[in-house]
Amino acid sequence: MFGLFNRSTGKVINVNDIDNLIGKINLIDIREAYEYRSGSIKTAKNIPMGELLESPEKYLNKDKEYHILCQSGARSARACSKLTGLGFDVVNVSGGVGSYVGSKRK
């Protein structure tokens, strides 16, 4: 799609390039619940990073692609690295909610 691939970080897309993908992608906000409640991006499902990494098979299907989002892109990059290593198809949403200027905020 619009993501670019970098060997060291895997698939990455800038948060401000996802507006036209909202509703068509599996978007997961890995921030803590209190952070998520303060605002996220429409259709993002909240699964805190600790829970997701503890039991990824509980939340993710290896046959689907997931876009992983956090506040700045740092946590999502770490999570994507671990999830990719486990065989999941993930895209890091760089910049995170903190950099998002699109119209799909909730």
PLM segments and residue spans:
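Rhodanese-like catalytic fold shared by cysteine-dependent sulfurtransferases
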Residues: 1-16, 21-25, 33-65, 74-106
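Short, surface-exposed ligand- or partner-binding patches at beta-edge/loop junctions that are enriched
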Residues: 69
